[in-house]
Swiss-Prot record:
InterPro entries: DHS-like_NAD/FAD-binding_dom, Myo_inos_IolD, THcHDO_hydrolase_firmi, THDP-binding, Thiamin_PyroP_enz_cen_dom, Thiamin_PyroP_enz_TPP-bd_dom, TPP-bd_CS, TPP_enz. It comes from Bacillus cereus (strain ZK / E33L). The gene is iolD1. It is an enzyme of class 3 (hydrolase). It holds the Pfam family TPP_enzyme_M. This is 3D-(3,5/4)-trihydroxycyclohexane-1,2-dione hydrolase 1. Its EC number is 3.7.1.22. GO terms for biological process: inositol catabolic process; isoleucine biosynthetic process; L-valine biosynthetic process. NCBIfam families: myo_inos_iolD (TIGR04377). It comes from the Bacteria. Thiamine diphosphate binds at residue 65. GO terms for cellular component: acetolactate synthase complex. The keyword Magnesium applies. Mg(2+) binds at residues 493, 520. Pathway: Polyol metabolism; myo-inositol degradation into acetyl-CoA; acetyl-CoA from myo-inositol: step 3/7.
Length: 644
C-alpha cells in the first residue's frame, strides 16, 4: 500500500482539493475555497498547510468569524448547494463566533464546512490560551457547542481519524435531504502531527447528487387525492430552486390551472409576472396568495419546510376539507401537517405527476379567482409604491403606534421617505438580473410581498434562521458565486450595526457589493410586534438615555452610516428623497468599488400583514388592558389553527 507522510492539516487540504460533485451529468469542484481568520489555534497547523500548498483552493481573509461563515453559506445558497466554501478559525472565541453561522446553515439546509481550531488533544499545556475548563468533564471545549447546530460533528484527536471523519463530512455536505453545517474540530497539536496516509484517501472523489424518484404507491395516492380536489394551491419552496425544478412547476401550474405561492426560499424560482404566481404566502405574504390559500381544499407543498411564517402558525388554511400533499426529498419535512408524503426530488415528482394527471384530464375548478386575486394585489402594490408622507394628517401603514410623533422622526432623520415607496423605486431601477440579499427586520416582509423578481434566482433571502447581520456578508458570498451580477444587501440599521465586517473583505477582494441601508433609527420590526400585542414602545427605538427618567426615552439617535462606511473606502451616498435615491442608484451602478446608500426612512411605513396571524408568546396575565386584549386575540386565533 502506497502512503504519503503528511501532517493532519496538509492531508485535509489535499483531500478537499479532490472533492467533486455531479448533478444531472455536470461535474464540478465541490469546494471552491476557504475563509480564514488565523490565530494560535490554527495558524501554524492548517495555516501552514495552506501556505505550503493550497492546491486550487482560493484562500480568503475574513474580518469576523460569523461574517465569513455567513458569506460561505450565502455562496453555497446562491450556487444551489452544488459548490461550497470552508471556514477555519482559531480556538475559543474565534470558533464560538461561527456557532451562529452553523445554526443558520443547518436551519436552511445549506452546506458549509467549518474547521474550528481546538484545545490540545494531549492536554499537556492545559489550560491553553482561550480554553474553557469544565471541572466535571475535561474533554469538553468551546467547540462542543457546535454539536447542537451541526448536521455532522467530529473531533480529530488522532491524525488517522481524519479519514473516516472527512468521508462522513462529504456524505452530509452532499446529501440534499439532510445537509447543513458540518463541523470538524481540529485540536491545534493534531493539526501539525504527521501520519502515513494511504494514497487512496487522496483519490478524486465524485459525489453524485441523485434525483430520487417517487414510489408508485405514493404517486398513486397523490393522484387519487388531487383528482378529488377542486381548488388546490401549490407552495413553491426552496427545494424547487435547489432541485432546479422551476420549469416543471410552471408546466404543472399551466397544465392543471393551479396557482402557487412562494416562500422566502422559493421566491424567484419563477418570475413574479407568471400568471399562476400569486407571490409571497403566509405571515409575510400578500393578499393574493393568502386569500387563495384560505379557501384551498388542497395544499401541495413542493420543497418547503412549512415554517410558521409559511403556514401563518398553521392558521392560514381555513377550508374544513383542506388536505396536504408534501413533495420533499426529506422524509422529515414531508411528514408535516399529516400530509400525504411524496418523498422524491421535486423535478422528478412533478414530471411524473404531470404524466399521471394528464391521463385523467385533471383541471382545477378555478374560474376568475386567480386573476382577480392577482389584480387585487397589483392594485394594492401600486398604492404602496405611491405612499407619501403628508404631515399631521398622515396615517402610516402600521397605524396606532407612532401616529402622533412621526414628525419627531421627520426632524431627526431629515427625511419624509416611506419604506414602501423606497422599495418600489429600487425595484424599478435595479437591473433585471441583479441579486438582492436580505435576512432580518421588516425588510423580509416587504420584499416577499412587494419585490417583483424579473429573472430567476435573483432573490436571496435567509429566513430559515433570519440571522441578524447576515445581509452584508451574504451579499459578499453571493457576489463570489455570481461575479458578473450586481448584488445588493437590503439591510436595516439594526441588522447593519450587528454585523457588517465583510464589507471590508469585499473591498479587499475587489468584489463590489451594494449596501442599501434603511435607517429608521430602531428595531422597527420588533417595535411593531410589541406594540401590536399591547405593549408600549420599550427598548426598540434608538434613543438616548433620558437623564431625568433614566430610561431610553430621550432624543432619537442620529447616525451617519455613510460617513462611517466612507472611512473603509466605500463609495457612499446620503438619501432623504426619491430623487436622491434615483441618482444614487444610477451612479452606484457605475462604481467599481463597493457602495453604501444611507436611506433615511420613517418608521411604521413598512407593509403590514395581509389575512394572516403569527403565534407569539403573549403574556397571559398583565396589568395592561391592551396586553390582556392581545392575549384574548391569541386564544381566539389559536382556536382556528391546527394543533400540529
Amino acid at each position: 500500500m502506497q502512503t504519503v507522510r503528511m501532517t493532519t492539516a496538509q492531508a485535509l487540504v489535499k483531500f478537499l482539493n479532490q472533492q467533486y460533485v455531479e448533478f444531472d451529468g455536470k461535474q464540478q469542484k465541490f469546494i471552491k475555497g476557504i475563509f480564514t481568520i488565523f490565530g494560535h489555534g490554527n495558524v501554524v497547523g492548517l495555516g501552514q498547510a495552506l501556505e505550503e500548498d493550497a492546491g486550487e483552493l482560493e484562500v480568503y481573509q475574513g474580518r469576523n468569524e460569523q461574517g465569513m461563515a455567513n458569506a460561505a453559506m450565502a455562496f453555497a445558497k446562491q450556487k444551489h448547494r452544488k459548490q461550497i466554501m470552508a471556514c477555519t478559525s482559531s480556538v475559543g472565541p474565534g470558533s464560538a463566533n461561527m456557532i451562529t453561522s452553523a445554526a443558520t446553515a443547518s436551519a436552511n439546509n445549506i452546506p458549509v464546512l467549518l474547521l474550528p481550531g481546538d484545545v490540545f488533544a494531549t492536554r499537556q499545556p492545559d489550560p491553553v490560551l482561550q480554553q474553557i475548563e469544565q471541572t466535571h468533564d475535561l474533554s469538553i471545549s468551546t467547540n462542543d457547542a457546535f454539536r447542537a447546530v451541526s448536521k455532522y460533528w467530529d473531533r480529530i484527536n488522532r491524525p488517522e481519524q481524519l479519514m473516516t471523519a472527512m468521508i462522513q463530512a462529504m456524505r452530509v455536505l452532499t446529501n440534499p435531504a439532510d445537509t447543513g453545517a458540518v463541523t470538524i474540530c481540529l485540536p491545534q497539536d493534531v493539526q501539525g502531527e504527521a501520519w502515513d496516509f494511504p494514497s487512496y484517501f487522496f483519490q478524486k472523489r465524485v459525489h453524485r447528487i441523485e434525483r430520487r424518484l417517487p414510489t408508485k404507491a405514493s404517486l398513486a395516492d397523490a393522484v387519487e387525492m388531487i383528482k378529488r380536489k377542486k381548488k388546490p394551491v401549490m407552495i413553491c419552496g426552496g427545494g424547487v430552486r435547489y432541485a432546479e425544478a422551476a420549469e416543471e412547476l410552471k408546466q404543472f401550474a399551466e397544465t392543471f390551472h393551479i396557482p402557487f405561492g412562494e416562500t422566502q426560499a422559493g421566491k424567484s424560482a419563477i418570475e413574479s409576472s407568471h400568471p399562476y404566481n400569486l407571490g409571497g404566502i403566509g405571515v409575510t405574504g400578500n393578499i393574493a396568495a393568502n386569500t387563495i390559500a384560505k379557501e384551498a381544499d388542497l395544499v401541495i407543498g413542493i420543497g418547503t419546510r412549512f415554517t410558521d411564517f409559511t403556514t401563518a402558525s398553521k392558521q392560514l388554511f381555513q377550508n374544513e376539507e383542506v388536505e396536504f400533499v408534501n413533495i420533499n426529498i426529506s422524509e422529515f419535512h414531508a411528514n408535516k401537517l399529516d400530509a400525504l408524503k411524496v418523498i422524491a426530488d421535486a423535478k422528478e415528482a412533478l414530471l411524473t405527476l404531470i404524466d399521471e394527471l394528464q391521463v385523467i384530464d385533471y383541471r382545477s375548478s378555478y374560474t376568475v379567482e386567480i386573476a382577480d386575486a392577482k389584480e387585487a394585489w397589483e392594485t394594492e402594490l401600486s398604492r404602496l409604491h405611491n405612499i407619501r408622507f403628508t404631515g399631521q394628517d398622515f396615517t402610516p401603514e402600521v397605524e396606532g403606534h407612532f401616529d402622533g410623533n412621526l414628525n419627531e422622526y421627520v426632524d431627526a432623520l431629515g427625511s419624509q421617505l416611506t419604506q414602501t415607496a423606497v422599495i418600489g423605486q429600487i425595484n424599478t431601477l435595479l437591473d433585471e438580473d441583479a441579486i438582492i440579499v436580505g435576512a432580518a427586520g421588516s425588510l423580509p416582509g416587504d420584499l416577499q410581498r412587494m419585490w417583483a423578481s424579473r429573472k430567476p434566482n435573483t432573490y436571496h433571502m435567509e429566513y430559515g434562521y433570519s440571522c441578524m447581520g447576515y445581509e452584508v456578508a451574504g451579499a459578499l458570498g453571493a457576489k463570489i458565486a455570481e461575479p458578473s451580477k450586481e448584488v445588493y444587501a437590503m439591510v436595516g440599521d439594526g441588522s447593519y450595526q450587528m454585523l457588517h465586517s465583510e464589507l471590508v473583505t469585499s473591498l479587499q477582494e475587489n468584489k463590489k457589493i451594494n449596501v442599501l441601508l434603511f435607517d429608521n433609527s430602531g428595531f422597527g420590526c420588533i417595535n411593531n410586534l410589541q406594540m401590536g400585542n399591547g405593549m408600549g414602545s420599550f427598548g426598540t427605538e434608538f434613543r438616548y438615555r433620558n437623564q431625568e427618567t433614566r430610561k431610553l426615552d430621550g432624543a432619537i439617535m442620529k447616525i451617519d452610516f455613510a460617513a462611517s462606511a466612507a472611512g473603509y473606502g466605500v463609495k457612499t451616498y446620503h438619501v432623504t428623497s426619491l430623487e436622491q435615491l434615483r441618482e444614487a442608484l444610477i451612479d452606484a451602478k457605475k462604481q467599481t468599488v463597493s457602495t453604501l446608500i444611507d436611506i433615511k426612512v420613517l418608521p411604521k411605513t413598512m407593509t403590514n400583514g395581509y389575512e394572516s396571524w403569527w403565534h407569539v408568546g403573549v403574556a397571559e396575565v398583565s396589568k395592561s388592558q391592551s396586553v390582556q386584549a392581545a392575549y384574548e386575540s391569541k386564544v381566539s386565533n389559536l382556536q382556528q389553527a391546527r394543533s400540529y
